[in-house]
Amino acid sequence: PKVARTIVRLMAKPDDEKGLIHAHSYAIADRLRELLDEFGVSGRVRGHDSDNRDAALSGWKRSDDPDVFVSVKMEEALDLAGDLCRWQVLCKAPYPNTNDSRVARRLEDGQWNWYYRTALRTVIQACGRVVRAPEDHGATYLADSSLLDLFGRARSDMPPWFERQVDRLERPDLPAFDPGRAGGAESDSASRNRPNRGSDTRSIEDHPLSDVWGDG
């Protein structure tokens, strides 16, 4: 619920800009959409399942509405330059799935540095989705303290430019939790693209992490 409430607060900002949520798994994405529906803001929320992923993404990108797209596994190869997206949320540290036998075998061999390094690489890729050029701008928000823990564990593997941005982490001044200000009531846009699974400064200030925070 804490992550969903944070998303509602971001949606209540007066900018009316598109946002992207990196949910990391379909289970997290489904739960977030359920909570956002309960909060009454589902009219501004879009999502996808494994079958309509590309179509749902294309529809969101084409839309002029300030909708929020709840995504799964979209940390790489996604170009959201300019007004296509101005803010994004990382819900948790994207560690490899330990139920994968290959991952489990590596950890049995003590390859924990690989485990943390892989998650860090995914975070770095995700941070580059909304800032695509020196003159572009966007904000990345960290919604869970597991990301801060990852930064501590993988510090030695950080590129210098990323480490500088991590050192500049700060907590943003967000509006109070008020679904009414966030818009997206069901009457505004009845369950638009809301799938349920099974059915369907030219300087450091413009860096992807120039407005990042951790809520521990």
Role assignments for model-derived ranges:
Residues 1-216:
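ASCE RecA-like P-loop NTPase motor cores
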